Amino acid sequence: MAKYVFFISTEPYKYQAVDTLIEIAKAALKKGHEISGIFFFGTGVYNLKKEISCGNSIRNIPEKIEKFSRENNIPVAGCSTWVSITGLKEHEFIEGASEEGLGDFSNWAIDADKLIVFGTGG
């Protein structure tokens, strides 16, 4: 079975990247594959902010990530440089998320069989 790592650099509500990521990851897990981690880069780190204001009629992306990662024991990390640039603090993150550098992400990617990237597209 394959080992997957996901990389996401899109904001929570601009695209459906997180929704798509979770559905792909669920399908991979169902087939017996492993998810080694989900790394948030650039403005994608905003996906990790637990106190995001989305109202009652919009899905809560950070909550979806937290629930999925907790239920499946998947590491979730935000790029330390981008966390600093955006002014986020690690205590503002969803439960289980951490702040990691690109070196840590590189180790995840090297150990993975598949790297799936969700970016802004261009």
Regions found by a protein language model. Give the residues of each.
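Extreme N-terminal starter segment of soluble prokaryotic enzymes
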Residues: 1-5
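Ligand-binding beta-strand-loop-alpha-helix segment within the catalytic cores
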Residues: 78-81, 86-88, 94-97
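Histidine-anchored nucleotide/phosphate-binding helix
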Residues: 18-33, 38
